[in-house]
Amino acid sequence: MIRDIYDVIVIGAGPVGGYLAWKLTEKGLSVLLVEEHPEIGRPFQCAGMVNPSAMDRIGAYDTVLTRIWGARMYSPSGTEIVIGDPNTTRTWSVCRKLFDERVVQLSLDSGADLLLSSKPVSANVTKSGVEISLDINGEIKQFQCRMLCGADGAHSWVRRTFKMGRPKELLIGFQIEVTGYPGEEGRLDLFTGDEFAPGFFAWAIPSGNTTRIGNWSLPNKLGEESCEDLLQVLMKSSQWKGRFSNCKEVGRYCGPVPSGMIHKPVIDRVAVFGDAAGLCKPTTGGGIGKGFEQVDLMLPKLVEAISTNDFTPSTVKNLNDTISTLRRNQNKSRALRNVFLTESTDEELDELFSVWSQPEVIDLINQLGDIDNPIPLGMKMLKDVPEFRRLASKAAAALIWG
């Protein structure tokens, strides 16, 4: 039964909101999850990738469509690099609806309450808590909580309402789901080229009986074209049209990718998590794993603050400090991405691929490559691969200072 007063109200019942609610209820706190859509896991707005560490936390292996252990990467001119070890899982391609439902169900089984077709209308922080009005199927009702948490995505209502700033980067992604793509089981495909993914890459991810094909970039690199337009350029290009000629579209998705943590994810009695905080990885756009990591890092001090109803400035500062490593690592990952990809011309990318294709470099990638943490591999290549040393000065400041 839905109550009027909770310890925590979480706006957004996606995987990060569900995970947060689960962990808080496990600690004995009362939690209300609020989801604006009539069902969990819809609409679907990402590539459906869950990294191993995130999957280990949930154990939702029955939601897996394909285990990804390797990749085929292509330079703008078509140089192919094949990486991966079938014995090492790099990431999981999942059914996001089932995965999201599984995470939210964990929170419900642990004692959280859930409101569907509901959204916040207004909220006000007081000395003792947060007063919030929710629109529940068209009816406005009042609630109170000690803390309000936003896990409500790139355009977070919580973040905007409390003027918590904007993520450093807001990229745009577009994806279609198709049948008929001649992929290789267990390997995803990555395509680089300014014509169809300026500064970034396009992908083809095996997902059970279908393949998810998409691209992403920064708005200022797209000019007057959309990611959808540029994806068609890839699929119809003389170089790659044979790869896509038998594809039949069965679904499409478009959405923002916020990457660059906001200055203070916690203010007063309000906190934002995951995409709402700008936590997507600058190298892949993935956000679930980093959102889970944020929750785990903040959890002990978060539970203490909520339990004691202590949200003094020093407590809030301590909460923000718990995730400072996430910010530094995100900045370093972005610096490496810029050096090796975003700031490179097609000609420079072809040169980089000619180095990456060397057997000793592929061995290094297979040894140190980590979809969660590209920093060790990037640092090792800058240090040990002679052809990459000229890039080191470009990345030095960001890599050192984060």
Describe the role of every protein-language-model region.
Residues 2-14:
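Beta1/beta-strand and adjacent pyrophosphate-binding region of the FAD-binding site
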Residues 13, 106-242, 278:
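Predominantly flavin-linked oxidoreductase catalytic cores and closely associated redox partners
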Residues 17-18:
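N-terminal Rossmann-fold NAD(P) dinucleotide-binding loop
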Residues 22-44:
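Glycine-rich FAD pyrophosphate-binding loop
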Residues 41, 57-72, 165-170, 313-315:
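A short alpha-helix-loop-beta-strand transition element characteristic
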Residues 51-104:
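A conserved beta-strand/loop capping segment in the N-terminal third of enzymes
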Residues 222-302, 306-307, 317-318:
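FAD/FMN-dependent oxidoreductases across multiple families
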Residues 303-402:
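C-terminal helical "tail/cap" subdomain of flavin- and related membrane-associated enzymes
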